[in-house]
UniProtKB/Swiss-Prot annotation:
Residues 1-13, 60-79, 273-285, 667-681 have a biased composition (Low complexity). This is Serine/arginine repetitive matrix protein 5. It comes from the Eukaryota. Residues 1-715 are annotated as: Disordered. Coiled coil: none annotated. The gene is SRRM5. Residues 359-388, 397-521, 539-595, 611-628 have a biased composition (Basic and acidic residues). Residues 32-59, 92-104, 213-224, 257-272, 657-666, 682-715 have a biased composition (Polar residues). Residues 80-90, 112-136, 286-320, 522-536 have a biased composition (Basic residues).
Length: 715
């Protein structure tokens, strides 16, 4: 009953928004920045935004989404809320009931973020802009939101403005709410975080909103967000702010109070189901700090649940956006980066394919997972596999991505949206991967996509969807290798660097067509394969790898160039990796091949070339597999070059040389010897790549050159 009322209001709002929409649209960029996470919602509800808008008639969607919108609108300023809401929520709000389940999170998160963002500017125009803005925002959000990977920053930025705008309202929790919520919304919104964190805001906002009857009344109607917003526009900033939080955060509570309590509850449950924990945290009326803690705490935790659902979506976005916020999640997630990327990676990779539309999403999710989330994307690229799988999920999607460690992991890895995922994808080096990378909504995804030379790799990297996350995820794929990549690797860089040591490396991989030469070139970039392998591997690649890996790793690389190094590297990689690598050395090679996504496919495609490539792909595919399995796939042979190539995986993947390298790597003895060395190098090359990514940024210019290299090579 209230829903229709609200629906009508949103419709009305939509009309005003129509004209306000341009104005509202301008805000979306800022909002989008913070709404990066919102994009995951868009990803989550890619069609839903339109459907939701069209679905305005659907009371359920209107209820929940509006509820969420209502929650947030008051919290954010009338303008912010209206803007954000109109932007993200009004169209959705009206149709949000339908969208509530799906769009509730998406819209909620997006609206939350967007509201926070838009709350800055359009206090007055917010009403009109609300519907329009929300719709455009929805439409715009994907690109815009996706683009800004600094969702946490943006969210914070936006949050602050929102808070500032809300200034009179409850800057205390207006901002935290906006910050946390925006962050939460940015992250959890996609995951459960939004609800859980917004509930923190909700507790605050709800309290305020409860106090703010106009807001509450508005919030009462599912579609009441327009009412609420309209009422809120008249309402004091405080009401609005509280309402924004209340509406946004209190879809469940505020709505519980309101007639649309069911809507609120539905949303709360939808969100609370997804964001139940987060909402509990947030809704516990924790102040922004609690919510901040909640959001961070629940980033991991909530991400676990919702995230598994939405891991990819929110994670991609949140990863980038919540990079800083997720820093701890990145660490938590991927040990630091690996975790984040792993989490983001696995689900994101899986979903990254699906949700690739949010480049930022994976970024947001990956980064959302941790400040290092971008690091998770980038740095956690190697981690992203592991943690991407582990905690890939940024709030919703990301959480789903990363945390959703499951077959979705492959998808999640793809879902692991992160620029670095693209990198990983580039690393994955395959049209599929590239496609996944593309889906992996992230520039870096494209990079990874480039890297995703092969479908397998692409798939793996799709899994490793956020380049870092995907990479992490890929790496995480094989817990050891991925973990090593995650732990060791500067996720994206490293892996990209490792893989995409540089076009040169790749070239050398290509040059390294010769088994010995190629392997050494892969390792060394120089015909002097052994010397270069030692030199490049030890001094150059190893140094890079080790460097990236760590001074110790480098040392280990150099020292461990011998089986010792390999052992150390393997050790460094992890027992699993070591085991895998060692196993790879022996029957493990075939086992690793099997382990590889397509053991035969990758190992067996053209064992020399297709297999190598496929192995490289496999390597990409299961970054772990890719590094370990792919490399292990060519356990002895490919293992070394694979390992060498895992670091060069991008190169390899980028170039058939990698395949040749792999082929060459087929030489079990030589490669095997180096395999652990090199592959650990690969894992450590992640670290090395981290360093090398840093040191070799010019070399690979992680994002750009790697993208270029990956893309070029992919192309």
């Amino acid at each position: 009953m209230s829903s229709p009322k609200r629906s009508s209001k949103p419709s009305m709002s939509l009309a005003p928004s129509g004209s306000s929409m341009p104005t509202a649209d301008p805000k979306p960029p800022a909002s989008l920045k913070s709404t990066k996470s919102a994009t995951p919602n868009r990803s989550l509800v890619p069609t839903k935004p339109a459907t939701s808008r069209n679905s305005v008639m659907s009371p359920s969607s209107s209820k929940s989404t509006k509820s969420t919108s209502t929650k947030r609108a008051p919290s954010n300023r009338p303008s912010s809320r209206s803007r954000v809401r109109s932007k993200a929520r009004t169209p959705s709000r009206v149709s949000t009931d339908t969208r509530t389940s799906k769009a509730s999170k998406a819209s909620d998160v997006r609206c939350h973020q967007r509201r926070g963002t838009h709350s800055r500017g359009r206090t007055p125009g917010r009403r009109g802009s609300r519907s329009s803005k929300r719709s455009p925002s929805r439409a715009s959000t994907p690109g815009r939101i996706r683009t800004h990977g600094a969702r946490p920053g943006m969210a914070s930025r936006v949050r602050t403005p929102t808070s500032q705008q809300k200034g009179s309202r409850g800057k205390s929790y207006g901002r935290p709410r906006t910050s946390n919520r925006e962050r939460s919304d940015s992250q959890p919104r996609n995951l459960s975080k939004k609800s859980y964190r917004p509930p923190g805001g909700s507790g605050i906002g709800r309290s305020s909103e409860l106090a703010v009857t106009p807001s509450t009344a508005k919030c009462q109607t599912p579609t009441g967000i327009p009412s609420k917003e309209k009422s809120d526009n008249p309402s004091p900033s405080s009401s609005r702010k509280v309402k924004s939080y209340g509406q946004m955060i209190i879809p469940s509570r505020e709505k519980s109070y309101s007639p649309t309590e069911m809507s609120s509850r539905v949303k709360s449950y939808n969100q609370a189901s997804t964001r139940s924990r987060p909402q509990s945290h947030s809704q516990s009326r924790s102040p922004r700090r609690s919510r901040s803690g909640s959001q961070k705490r629940t980033h991991s935790r909530v991400r676990s649940h919702s995230w598994k659902r939405n891991h990819s979506r929110a994670r991609s976005r949140t990863r980038k956006g919540i990079l800083s916020q997720m820093g701890r999640h990145s660490q938590s997630r991927s040990h630091s980066k690996g975790k984040s990327q792993n989490q983001s990676r696995t689900p994101r990779r899986g979903r990254s394919h699906n949700w690739s539309r949010n480049p930022s999403k994976e970024r947001s999710h990956s980064h959302s997972r941790s400040s290092s989330k971008e690091r998770d994307h980038r740095g956690s690229s190697s981690p992203r596999k592991e943690s991407g799988r582990s905690q890939s999920g940024s709030p919703n999607k990301q959480r789903d991505h990363s945390r959703s460690r499951s077959p979705n992991k492959a998808r999640d890895r793809s879902r692991s949206r992160s620029p670095y995922k693209a990198r990983d994808r580039s690393r994955s080096r395959s049209p599929n991967k590239a496609r996944d990378c593309s889906r992996s909504r992230s520039p870096y995804k494209a990079r990874d996509r480039s890297r995703s030379r092969s479908p397998n790799k692409a798939r793996d990297h799709s899994r490793s969807r956020s380049p870092n996350k995907a990479r992490d995820r890929s790496r995480s794929r094989s817990p050891s290798k991925e973990r090593d990549h995650s732990q060791l690797g500067s996720p994206s860089k490293e892996r990209d660097h490792r893989r995409s040591r540089s076009p040169s490396k790749e070239r050398q991989c290509r040059q390294s067509r010769s088994s010995s030469k190629e392997r050494d070139h892969r390792r060394s970039r120089s015909p002097s394969k052994e010397r270069q392998r030692r030199q490049s591997r030890s001094p150059n690649k190893e140094r890079d790898r080790s460097q990236s890996r760590s001074p110790s790793e480098e040392r280990e690389h150099r020292q461990s160039r011998s089986p010792s190094k390999e052992r150390d590297r393997r050790r460094w990689r992890s027992p699993s990796k070591e085991r895998e690598r060692r196993q790879s050395r022996s029957s493990s090679e075939e086992r690793d091949h099997s382990r590889s996504r397509s053991p035969n496919k990758q190992s067996g495609y053209s064992r020399p070339r297709a297999s190598s490539k496929e192995k490289a792909h496999s390597r990409s595919r299961t970054p772990s597999k890719e590094g370990n399995h792919s490399q292990s796939r060519t356990s002895s042979k490919e293992s070394d070059p694979s390992q060498s190539t895992v670091p060069r995986s991008p190169d390899w993947k980028r170039s058939p040389t990698r395949t040749s390298s792999l082929s060459q790597n087929r030489t079990p003895s030589k490669t095997s010897s180096h395999s652990p060395s090199t592959f650990p190098s690969g894992g450590q090359t992640l670290s090395q790549d981290d360093s090398q990514a840093d040191a070799t940024t010019s070399k690979a210019t992680l994002p750009g050159e790697r993208s270029s290299s990956s893309s070029s090579k992919l192309a």
